Amino acid sequence: MAELHIPLDIKSLEILSQHINSKGEIILTVQSKKTETPCHKCGKPATSRYGYGPELTIRHLPILDTPVYLVIKPVRYKCSDCDDLITTSESYDWLKRGAHVTNGLSDYLMRQLIHSTIEDVSIKERIGYKQLENTVNKAIDIQVNWQNYTSLSLLGIDEIALKKGHKDYVTVISTKPEKAAQVTVIAVLPGRLKKDVAAFLKTIPENLRKTIQSVCTDMYDGFVFAVTEVLGDAVLIVDRYHVAKLYRQPLDKLRVREMKRLKSTLSEEEYAQLEGVMWTLRKKHECLSDAEKETLVLLYHYSPKLKEAHSHALRLTQILNTHCSKKSGLAKINRWIKRVKKSDSTCFNGFLITLEKYKTYVGNYFKNRSNSGFVEGLNNLIKVAKRRCYGIFKTETLFQRLYLDLQGFEIYA
C-alpha cells in the first residue's frame, strides 16, 4: 500500500504514533511541546509538572475523507505561586476548553453549516448531531459581541412570526454599516413589547449609541415608543415603504369597488378594454407603455373618483421621491394633507389620521433618505432559514443561524 507523509498542521504537537482502527479511522497519538500553562487561579505561568490528566480523544480535520482523531494525555502543572498546591491541566491554542473537536475542524464545520442545517452537516461529515450542536454553541455566541462594532449608523427593527398563525413573534434588530453591503443582526428578542426593545437599546454601549444616526421601523407603537424613549425623536424614521403600503391600500379598495360598479354599467366590450388596470395603477407613470396610458385615460373617463384618488397617491409618491430637507418635505406633506381633505376623496381618511400621528418620523426620512429595504431583504432570508430548518423556535438558535448565514463566509472562509 502506498504511503503518504504529510505534516500535522498543529505546530505545538508532536506525533508519537499513528494507526488505523477497525472503523478505518486515523488515530494519532500526540503530546504537547509546551512546557508551561497559565494557572487557572492566579493566571501566572505554572511550570512544575504534576502528572497527567485523563486521556482525551479529539476529532481533527479529515484526511482524504477519512476521520482523524488526536489522542493526548494533558499534562497537569503545579503552580508555585499559589499556597494550596493548585494544579492546572494544560490548555491548548488548538482546542477550546471542554470541546471535543479541534479549532480547525470547528471552523470547517461552521463553513459547512452556512445556508445548511445541523442535521445535513451531521450526516455529510459523519459527526453526531449533539456534538455538532455543542460545537456551534462553543463557536458562536447567542448574543451580540459589541467589541466587533465601531459604529451603528443605521439600525432596522422589525418583527417576524416564528409560527405562522400563532402570533409567536420575535423582534429582529439589525444594522447596516455605511461602507459595508452586508447586513448584520445584533439582536433577536422574544416577543415585540416596547419594554423588551427599550431594555435592549439601553444595553448598547454609550460610545456606540452616539454613532446611531437613523433607526428605521414601521408604525408599530411598541417599536416607535421604545426608540424615542431611549434614543430620542431625531433618529427614528418611519419607513417610506410602510407609508406607501398604507396609502396604496385604500386606493386598491376603491379600485375594486369602482371596477365592480363599472362591470354592472358598461358593456362587455367596454369593460374588456379596462383589463389589467390593477397593474396599471400600481406602476410608475413613466414606466407605462402607450397602451397602458390609453387604458388609464379610459379608466379616468369612466371613474372620476379613481382618477382623483390616483392623482393624490401619485403626488405623495412624488413628494417622497423628492430630494429636499426635512422642513421642506414636511411642508409638502402638510400641503398634500390639506389638498386631500378639501377634495371629494374620502378613501384616504383613515390613512390621514395615521400620517398626522407619525408625520414627524416620516419627515426624518428626508434627512439622509434612509429606509429599511435591507430589513425586508433580511426577512426573506429568515423565512428561508425557517423553512430549511423545519422551524426555529428558540431566539438564541435563530441568532446563531443568522450570524452564520450573514457573516459566516467573512469569518470562516
Regions found by a protein language model. Name each.
Residues 270-344:
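Helix-loop elements that line ligand-binding/catalytic pockets
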Residues 218-221, 227-268, 376:
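Conserved beta-strand -> loop -> alpha-helix junction used to position metal-binding or nucleic-acid-contacting
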Residues 1-84, 88-92:
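Short, conserved DNA-binding cores of transcription-related domains
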Residues 97-107, 187-191, 341-343, 349:
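Acidic, glycine-enriched active-site microenvironments
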Residues 28, 39, 79, 121, ...:
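Short, conserved catalytic/metal-binding motifs centered on acidic residues
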Residues 43, 57-155, 159-166, 210-212, ...:
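Short, positively charged, Gly/Tyr-enriched micro-motifs
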Residues 337-413:
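Basic, amphipathic alpha-helical segments enriched in Lys/Arg and hydrophobic/aromatic residues
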Residues 133-214, 221-226, 233:
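RNase H-like nuclease fold core
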